[in-house]
Amino acid sequence: MAPVTKFSRKIYKGEVNNDEAAYVFDILTRYMNPKPEGSLKVLDIGSKNWAYVKGEYDFFRKYCDNLTLDGVEIDAYRLYANLYSRFEAAKFYIKNLDGVKYYADDLMNISDKYDYIIWLLPFVTPQPLEKWGLPKKYFMPQELLEHAAELLKKEMFIVNQGEQEAEIQQKLLDRAGLQYKFLGEVESSIELFKNPRYGFLISK
């Protein structure tokens, strides 16, 4: 995979919340039900520092003997206040997880096929992208969604923040002609977030 230009070196505050992995494990358990198989290949889109990777890993390992779990993040070189990048943090979180890889890359450069795809908080409006200082050319929600669908073999779980983003996401899904189920507000016994989140399950 081609390396991504290290265009983002901004520093921002905020330490990793270790409950993220437990939250992700919880919502995957509530909303996904993979069929047990010998091998599974899973993609996480927009992984950030991938602090929650253990939640995804533990969930999907229940359903297979051999798991390949890839994470892709276009803004992998953003710095924390401690001067460690997302990429460096992600390497720490995945170091003891077999079959897990983190790619500092653009989703559009990914060409492998995946049984399942997890996409938490995709950019469906330009404001978050601008807030993080990413070039405007990377705001292409329709193209990214359709490319993700091309990579998908079974199911994709998308989570959006707030009703407005969920409504936009639904329009993107309709425009792409994808088969999906709107899950409503995503519930979890682990309360980490102030704003409600909404989910979609896309199937092939």
Regions found by a protein language model. Name each.
Residues 131-154:
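A short glycine-rich, Lys/Arg-flanked "PGG" loop and its adjoining helix->strand segment in the class I
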Residues 43, 47-101, 106:
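Class I SAM-dependent methyltransferase SAM/SAH-binding core
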Residues 116-138:
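A short SAM/SAH-binding and catalytic strip from SAM-dependent methyltransferases
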Residues 105-118:
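A short acidic, Gly/Pro-enriched loop at the edge of an enzyme's catalytic core
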Residues 36, 63, 150-153:
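A generic alpha-to-beta junction signature in SAM-dependent methyltransferases
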Residues 1-38:
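Class I SAM-dependent methyltransferase Rossmann-like catalytic core
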Residues 5, 9-14, 166-204:
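Class I S-adenosyl-L-methionine
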Residues 122, 156, 160-164:
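Short strand-turn motif at the edge of the Rossmann-like AdoMet-binding core
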